[in-house]
Amino acid sequence: MTHIDKQAFGAFVATLRKEKGITQKELAERLFLSDKAVSKWETAASVPSIDLLIPLADLLGVTVTELLMCRRMEQDNA
């Protein structure tokens, strides 16, 4: 099993959230969480539970793989 880099994960979530123009509170509300939970992800204090990965990725406009790898994957246009 691969270890998730909490720092990279948090920075990626924060970047994606800001690109979408939503606050921590708005993201938390859409996931039925507190804004403190989102803050903890973004400050590398914790990572979301596995059951939140799909809805989180959907809200941030990335795949679960991209979310876990903390980077966008190249798109093939072929």
What are these regions (language model features)?
Residues 51-66:
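DNA major-groove recognition helix of helix-turn-helix/homeodomain DNA-binding modules
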Residues 21-40, 55:
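Short alpha-helical DNA-recognition segment
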Residues 68-78:
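Short, charged recognition helix plus adjacent turn
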Residues 1-19:
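A short, Lys/Arg-rich alpha-helix, primarily the initiator
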Residues 43:
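Short, conserved catalytic or interaction motifs in soluble domains
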